[in-house]
Amino acid sequence: MAAESTKDMSVDLVAVERRLWSGQATFVSAQTTEGQIGIMPGHEPLLGQLVEGGIVNIVPVEGERIVAAVHGGFFSVTAGTVRILAESAEFAGEVDVDEARKVLADSAASDEELRVAQGRVRAVEQVASA
């Protein structure tokens, strides 16, 4: 793990059922109830509520960009640290796209199920377009 500097920040992506990722990053973006937010090192402290069916992007200091479908929860920024605390989350590569598309096509699906499925499909499409 790289030493903390003004060029990077500590990031934790955690869901109720598991810790998805923890490490140093240069950029994080997420969809909150107030809109899309991008965080770089040195950002002012803040607390935001994540949307259902949102996407989180993390640009780690080392390795490839991380994209996750995130369903509800909170996003906090404090001195040098970003924490994404989600009700549930999955990496784009873990998404069963066919299943998510079936939910989107199901007219009996609830609004929440539709938002989650939309977020899952968008996460996969974002990785595919990179």
Curated annotation (Swiss-Prot):
Major localization class: membrane
Keyword Membrane included in the entry's annotation: yes
Keyword Transferase appears in the UniProt entry: no
Subcellular location: Cell membrane
Keywords: ATP synthesis, Cell membrane, CF(1), Hydrogen ion transport, Ion transport, Membrane, Transport
Gene Ontology cellular component annotations, sorted alphabetically: plasma membrane; proton-transporting ATP synthase complex
Membrane-protein topology: Peripheral membrane protein
UniProt GO MF annotations: ATP binding; proton-transporting ATP synthase activity, rotational mechanism
The organism's place on the tree of life at top rank: Bacteria
Pfam families, A to Z: ATP-synt_DE_N (PF02823)
Subunit structure: F-type ATPases have 2 components, CF(1) - the catalytic core - and CF(0) - the membrane proton channel. CF(1) has five subunits: alpha(3), beta(3), gamma(1), delta(1), epsilon(1). CF(0) has three main subunits: a, b and c.
Similarity comment text for this entry: Belongs to the ATPase epsilon chain family.
Annotated function: Produces ATP from ADP in the presence of a proton gradient across the membrane.
Protein name per its UniProtKB record: ATP synthase epsilon chain
Source organism of this protein record: Nocardia farcinica (strain IFM 10152)
Gene it is expressed from: atpC
